[in-house]
Amino acid sequence: MKKINFAFIILFLFSLPLIIFYQPWVNALPPMPRHANPEQLEKTVRYLTQTVHPRSADNIDNLNRSAEYIKEVFVSSGARITSQDVPITGGPYKNIVADYGPADGPLIIIGAHYDSASSYENDELTYTPGADDNASGVAGLLELARLLHQQVPKTGVQLVAYASEEPPFFRSDEMGSAVHAASLERPVKLMIALEMIGYYDSAPGSQDYPYPAMSWLYPDRGDFIAVVGRMQDINAVRQVKATLLSSRYLSVYSMNALWFIPGIDFSDHLNYWQHDIPAVMITDTAFYRNKQYHLPGDTADRLNYQKMAQVVDGVINLLYNSK
């Protein structure tokens, strides 16, 4: 009996961190009708990647044209609009903020950065179209705006398009999300970063991970969406995972990770953690799947707009049902 009890204790102690990290048992919210429009998502991605390309820090005119496009969609959705200055030399750089629902009380924030990266290849400066990174996230944000116009949320919702996430601003006070997070006066229930939600690959071996052992828990095919948060964001990750699972045909995996796991803080949600705000990232896992990350091959034709629409449907389900 003692040996059995000891074995059970060892199994429990081994399994508990695994369950917390992986969260295998999350019940989906009831399914909802499909709302998001894949054609509109593609239209937004193509505008951002073709008409106003490149959207890098050294192309301020294109960034401002992108901001105006985003602002126009927010205005047409009936939101209360704020343009927030991001104090960077050579600007203006602006976050575009859209508020829906009650003007006071707790907020849910959904954010996505609209800038794109540049890089050097063979000592030559090149610009990525940034379809997945992060026109896909912005397209999701604007589709949420259109859907919030159709049904006003019962809780305060703030959609934020950030001007500066990519290098040289990443992990600095000049990130658009750092400026926004520091400016908040209302309590925040949850922040969600939409960071690369458009690239999917069902080929075996198409999904990589920071550590090889993670392939024991997660698929080797990159055909799922991921929800990522800190260990202390367990409830937030479960909430977002449950709402994404309400999109019936979307595979969803989650991770509550310790700080040293590479990639868990590679987007705008990291700045809300600095203010003790529950924040998660919805992502296709970026360069662990999309080999055109920050490269000229990150183009609109490589994205799956049906799956993007399913992600948006999951998020709007959360917003429609929040009180």
Regions inferred by a protein language model and the residue ranges of each:
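Acidic/histidine-rich catalytic neighborhood of metal-dependent amide-processing enzymes
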Residues: 128-232, 261-264
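A non-catalytic alpha/beta surface segment that caps or lines the substrate-entry region
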Residues: 47-103, 253-255
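N-terminal capping segment at the start of a domain
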Residues: 18-65, 77, 288-298
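Hydrophobic membrane-insertion alpha-helices, especially the h-region
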Residues: 5-21
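Second-shell loop/turn segments in exported
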Residues: 29-36, 51-61, 82-87, 123-134, ...
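Extracytoplasmic/secreted proteins, especially bacterial periplasmic and envelope-associated proteins
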Residues: 40-43, 47, 61, 65-76, ...
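Solvent-exposed loop/turn segments at secondary-structure junctions
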Residues: 87-89, 102-104, 114-118, 164-168, ...
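Active-site-adjacent substrate-binding region
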Residues: 190, 202-323
